[in-house]
Amino acid sequence: MIAKIIKGTNFSGVVSYMLSKREGQIKVLQANGVRSSLPNDIAHDFNLQASMHPSVQKPVCHTILSFSAHDLERLTDATMVKITNEYLHEMGYGDTQNLIVRHSDRQHPHLHICINRIGNNGKTISDHNEKYRSTKICRELTKRYGLTIGEGKQEVNRSRLRGEDKLRYEIFYTIKAVLPQSQTWKDFVTVFITIEQPKLIRNIRV
């Protein structure tokens, strides 16, 4: 289980994206403090609460929780909601509006959460060290629910990568292949440069 956190200013844009997939590819799992019907109504509900603290420039917290494809059969809607609510509670978002939508347009189970950083009490919810805290919480929840522990970059669908991201993962896989065969650091560097130098030259833009 991994989380990607994106801050923003526009609830309407996030909600529209979350609900814009084709029929059968999305499912609203939870609407806490907001309506669950039309995107404009949902965004209005979020904005109304955010207006309680207008000085906050980025009240939108769009979080994507992704799981290993190996856990697909185990991750029922109810289980994903339970895990997500535990994640939200431990991140400090237990007392604010949220919308949870499951997407099925990828091979791996994942869901999107739109969170209001302005709590139900009108106060801003702290995002201090949120990436560190999120990583730790995801690790704990993965163990707690006996989920598959992903192997970082190896869990990525490489066919979807472009540009710098594609090059970065090619380098990662080259290192993975070359390292076990290298007896010394010099051996590793020599083989690595031989393989990667042409790729780097092709991707450099002057």
Set out the residue ranges of the language-model regions.
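N-terminal nicking endonuclease/strand-transfer module with a His-rich metal-binding environment
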Residues: 1-206
